[in-house]
Amino acid sequence: MNPFQLNKYSDQEPSEKQQKRFPGWFALDFGTSNSTVTLFDPIEVPIAEILPKEQEMRLRDRLSQWLSSPASVALPDVSADDWEKFIAEISRNLDIEPSRLSEVFESDNKERFLEAIRQIELSLGNSERFRRAVSKKLYQIYHEVFRVPTLESQNLIPVVLDIDRRDTEIPSESEISQLSDLKLRMGREARDNRKKAIAQGTSGSLKEIISRFHHSPKRYFGQERLFPVILDGEEEIITANQLIQSAWAHLIELTEDYRQRAQRRFSEGDFLTAVVTYPTVAPPVVRKEVKELVEQLGIDDVQTAYDEAVSVAIFFLWREFGGNLNIGIESFKTRCHQAGNKWSQNVLVLDIGGGTTDLALIELTLEDKTPTFADYEDRGLGGRYYKLTPKLLGSSGHLQLGGELITLRIFRLLKVAIADFLLTAVTTGDLESEKLEDLINSELNERFLEQGKFKTGSLLKCLDKENPEGDIAYKDALDTAEKVLPTRWQQAPQRLQSFYILWDHAEAAKLKLGQKPPADNSLLTFTLSEQQISELLTQSAVKLQVKDPNSICVTLDNQQFERAAASGIKEAIGIAKGLMESRLRPDDITKDSWNSQKVDWLILSGKTCNLDVVQRQIYQEFSKSPYFVWNPERITFVLEFTKLATSAGACYAEKLRRLRFDPEESKSLLRKGANQLEIDVKNLFYYLPCNFKRKTQSNDLLTIFKAGQELYQLAPWETVAKVRTVWQGIQLTNIIYRQDYEDGDLRLWGSFDGKNLMNKLEMQEAEFLKKIKVQFEIDQTLEFNVLLCQGNPHYLIDIPGIDLESVVSETSALFADGKLNWNIAVEGFNKDLNDGDIAVNVIESATVDQPDAYHLVFEVGNDGSKLFQKFHYLRDGATQPGIGLISNPLPPFPQTGQHTFYVYQTDAETNSKKWIRIGALSKPDVTTDYPCQYRVTLDDQGILRMHAGEVPYWTSNSQECLKQEGCVYLAELELQPNEVDKERDPFCGIH
């Protein structure tokens, strides 16, 4: 077992015997409302005889349901007689009674199951109309079946986290069960314990209950919060991170418990590899803490590459292939735009969950990468090798925008509706209450009175609108409702029970009123009875004398629900629309947007997307957009996978990343006619998903990074992809914002205190601002570094190279008067050459009769004084720095794996032009995890060197180095903790 307890990991001695590792991994999706875990276990690979297990079960179920249904349900457009004849003929051919036909699909006899399908297709009768109806229904069933994700065939196991209910989802509500070695309970057990504790609690014990139960620990992520917890008379202070870490530990324990108790076989070994998802717009402080906190649980390999929106996209992409690459790939290609041997489409993921909204816009490109077969090689049955490359065009979202925000708005509406009803009933004499009468007579705001009496509906109208927060009376209405029905428990723990009872009613109202309205457009309603209202008032000391209990009820309808939910839903869909339009808008503003790139596939995820008002709002916004072709077939929402999709998608993505293989090795499979698919998951991290801007004195922000910028591996010893800004001036306060799309919200991402640095360097302000330069660096996790330097940076040279002195004329120095006298080049089209130009790929360009297809590396005659860099050496015995040039990125290496450099000369006697070979530099023998650019340096000693990535800076770990010119000091951006808007936090105690 893993050392899940928080305090044990640091005290443990290394074991003498190496731990036995579980050969797979698990993916954790810790949600605001619910959590799931998916396990990858390679212990056995099932062989499908008909279809993968999940698809076969769905096909059996759907056919059984269909053939057992009456004609009016099975095929509404055909006559009952035709349907009965159809069933009778199938039953006769299968030698079974029509009433027992469904048994064929429930038995394990596969031959009989296949024969039943054959008989369905043979028994279509003579009526063309009937045949069309049956064929259409069969197509719908098959289409649904082929879209069932084949989890088992991919060795992916949704972990049953709630053993008693056999449920793979568990509510994220948590109860602290142990303070020493902090432990939690989660799910319905925690929820039931909370209800029981509140019902039995006294005023004193309620404080303990508030400290012990946490409805949704995820909402604390990234916050520097402390929680005083009282348990069994002991009190301790715990941090938000400890609470979340304990929740992960509990999910891992539940996964281990399932492995021990499940009837299936599992591989042995300790869980030491994990994939952990996080919200798409989580700041880098969250991403960094995820990895650290899970590692502290004894998990030594933690992957945090996949945010929630990207994970959902990978899941539904996998579902799109239907578990059959031969059919799935061809089906996928028909929905793409083809250009040569590439097929592409744009996918927008909109995941509105319980607490957060996550978005990702991804370009999927399928490319035929089938290896070349030599003439003597057998091509066999001609399978194809495809590579699918997802490119992240942009991501966005909101950390406090989801289903719980909608429930909170229904909570407020319901609370005010109850208060309005009770005050009206007192005014009309339908009930008597001294407390409410005193409230009307002495405390009620005048806007709610008419001739000294409560004005019916005056409270409700303040909230029964789309954006009630903008109404000046909004707060007054809520404050008045609080006097009737107190639920604000932050300062009064005794109100906790009323809050949770009303919250449960609001959640029930959301689920009922959020359904699709009846066909006759009659209103859906949700009603609280007199008994339910009385239960709510038990804690408020409001005593009622009711004349007619049947007349006491409060009703909301679906129109009121939609008005309350509208602003949150429009906000989420507005973010999606803004992201889509900003990324797909043509660069040329004169170009017609209707002819621009479009979103080809919209994936909806998260249970909030099941609300009818969400789907109607999506139609309203997307159907008229020039960036989306409205087609219901290309809008995917599958309720049963709305939560599992995140952990399953992340688990599958990690499988693809770890089990990649070379196309050449697939030839034996291709000969058998089997298509192969590689999904280049890592490509998701090669481009920036959003903009970053720097605050200036005016309202205009300075863009430092643009969405879509390509990331590269800057140093061979690093395992991240990065991009840097140019060197720029520093400010006393350097503030960085994230902006997902133009005109989108600005999120404070981090800051760097230049004034503090200035004081440490003992510089005057004018000197500091003039001398100190800053360069920002960002990686694929959106984590910033701040590079600082006085003046221009110096570079560190620590690799060998080739000497140009042997080919450069003795009478002509390499550098003179601050200029380069010789040119160096590689392939590419260029202007007229000068003596001394140096090139690469000269021989390659001559081979293909393209003598101009070289690439100029260093050019003669340029004013090099501004381009010369200062070099410091770690080898060659050099004790003094020198000067030199750094090239732009070189073109790709030829197949030889080396660039050959030539110098251009004109023979003084014959006036003939020629290239003289300097020598070759091989591609550095380093393995890079991400795309890498290569550069060469040329110093004043005539040494030409090849570098992988950026030429490294001359650096120091001490800030004191900034007192001398050229030394680079690396600092970190001061990250911002998550700021929580209490108006959007249902469980902060102020509602």
Model regions and ranges:
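Glycine-rich phosphate-binding loops at beta-strand->alpha-helix junctions
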Residues: 271-289, 594-618
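Conserved phosphate-binding catalytic cores of ATP/NTP-utilizing and phosphoryl-transfer enzymes
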Residues: 2-23, 304-350, 369, 645-663
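A short acidic Gly-Thr/Ser loop motif
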Residues: 28-34, 340-358, 362-366, 402-403, ...
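Conserved phosphate-binding/catalytic loops in two-lobed NTP-binding clefts
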Residues: 298-311, 618-649
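Acidic, glycine/GT-rich loop-and beta-edge segments that sit at the periphery of enzyme/chaperone cores
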Residues: 19, 32, 48-52, 87, ...
